[in-house]
């Protein structure tokens, strides 16, 4: 009987006494098989069917070459490489060294290699390793690797083999529940898939430009039509599309489309995404499709969960992208324009995610420590690009395109990374005992921010038609970016002006006794006004009906610094028209940005809890000002003696935007009546009467708010070493870092 089964299991195989391959039973037990036909000795002893797998097995081993020719070949290759080093060194002696050369950038460009195979890529930045790793990376090495399996079969094997180390590592990252069940039953019905993809195309794709939408549309519907045979990478992409689409829907829409609550749908699709990422072997992937799916998932995840886990996954994806060479521009390796453009889009979206998540966790972006030559994406529409192109399409700067918003954010990322690297270099110089040198060149922070302002105003804002929702969003984001850079720069000046223990330090530019308070109040008033405008535009993004489909994304971009500064000022300023405007803006964004504390880790809560406390105290101050106008007036007189012009209303800078309306809020009307704060007036001593002084904003808050101050937010604002005694006061003289002007 066993012999018959053995014969049936090997149709067409020549009868021989010794088989080519190990039987399945011996291979599973990891024991040596004598490969006897029809049954090996191990199977006879175990009384099991002896089944030999079909096929010819692995490719025959290459005959070993003698050692002498191998050594000679390697020696010749080494001599050639050393010769290239010598030529490069001689060339460097004749030409001045640039900043990029000093970072090792040119070395990497000369000696790196990029292996691209269909939708996969692998990057090696050292030529010494290329030949040695070629066999390991791109040739079969296992016993049964005489043929190259398809992506689908290899992914399925990795997902179903319990002994796969890659699966164990992926399951450790995404949780061991990620290997619990098949994915087929998590796909939506055809009708639901149609609606979800429409929601994705309208709500998500314009903000996360990592795809070529005509190509993605074809891939999506081909996969939906054949779910039973779709490969793991494409299946992962399907689930991330569905997950991000659900993220962009409000609860009522989700209930109508999926017949389940938004919370239930998010839990189901997030589980499916995590399971697909684990089974698709994300940690070792070389697939662009898999990386696109992971980046899309991380772009949507902060709307539901912005814990430290999401930040850690961002770091993981960043390094996966580097192993695939996305930090190198495709033109260096002769890639086609279509592939080069998609690689650029994907890399810069990773940098955007990295910048946002690092800011929320009060850390520097990962990209700041790496050199990249990947150019920003082209300013084109998707219809201008096709896989068959041999030359890149011409950019369109006469009107806005699909990539306008992405490029606005790329401009900000580039400037932020340059400023961060400059700050590190200045700090390192200071630690060495030398004085930071500030030159009036293009390498100063002042000039970098001026150039950013000029690019946004001259290239992007003029082509944005604010009557078009997507262009309205792009214009608003550009103006928020300028306001944020202005706040960082001005706060650096304030930090350098502060007095330590009542005395000015020698390495800070000390204001004269006659102008100390006046200068501090003037800068603080400018900070207050700019913070209000940032919150005003942010409130418009959260409440405007014209861009309601993008509200899900705006909710995740909390302007921590501006909000904290406005709330702290409301706790100390007297009642005025400007404060009423600030209160309206704060109320709008506070409700829109409200954090679900049950889904956040301590790092995020370390930012949100002070905001909650500041909001409660600001409400208390407002109530006290309304019920005891005498106390409010006294406080106002104390401040106004310092600078009578401080609270004079200034004209609005965003007059073309509609004023945020409570009735437009997607998730219902905002609370217009602040809740009462437990405790009496004595429980918050001096809340409505503490005047502003020249000792600095956080010092005033220390006395007003007690132990919980703006500390977490101050860590997010760098102190620039270039604001020093010699250049600090003059570096911003005549420098307009304000928000964009409109004709």
Curated annotation (Swiss-Prot):
Gene Ontology biological process: DNA-templated transcription
Disruption phenotype: Leads to decreased production of bikaverin.
Residue range(s) of DNA binding per entry: 23-50
InterPro entries referenced in this protein's UniProt entry, alphabetically: Sec_Metabolite_Reg (IPR050613), Transcription_factor_dom_fun (IPR007219), Zn2-C6_fun-type_DNA-bd_sf (IPR036864), Zn2Cys6_DnaBD (IPR001138)
SUPFAM superfamilies (alphabetical): Zn2/Cys6 DNA-binding domain
Keywords: DNA-binding, Metal-binding, Nucleus, Transcription, Transcription regulation, Zinc
Location in the cell: Nucleus
Biased composition, class Polar residues, residue ranges: 624-635
Pfam families, per database record: Fungal_trans (PF04082), Zn_clus (PF00172)
Entry GO MF terms: DNA binding; DNA-binding transcription factor activity, RNA polymerase II-specific; zinc ion binding
Gene induction: Expression is repressed by glutamine and at alkaline ambient pH and highly induced under nitrogen starvation and acidic pH conditions.
CDD domains linked to this entry: fungal_TF_MHR (cd12148), GAL4 (cd00067)
Region spans: Disordered: 421-445, 623-643
GO CC annotation: nucleus
PANTHER family: UNCHARACTERIZED TRANSCRIPTIONAL REGULATORY PROTEIN (PTHR31001), ZN(II)2CYS6 TRANSCRIPTION FACTOR (EUROFUNG) (PTHR31001:SF57)
Function: Transcription factor that regulates the expression of the gene cluster that mediates the biosynthesis of bikaverin, a red pigment also considered as a mycotoxin.
Official protein name in the record: Bikaverin cluster transcription factor bik5
Gene source species: Gibberella fujikuroi (strain CBS 195.34 / IMI 58289 / NRRL A-6831)
Gene: bik5
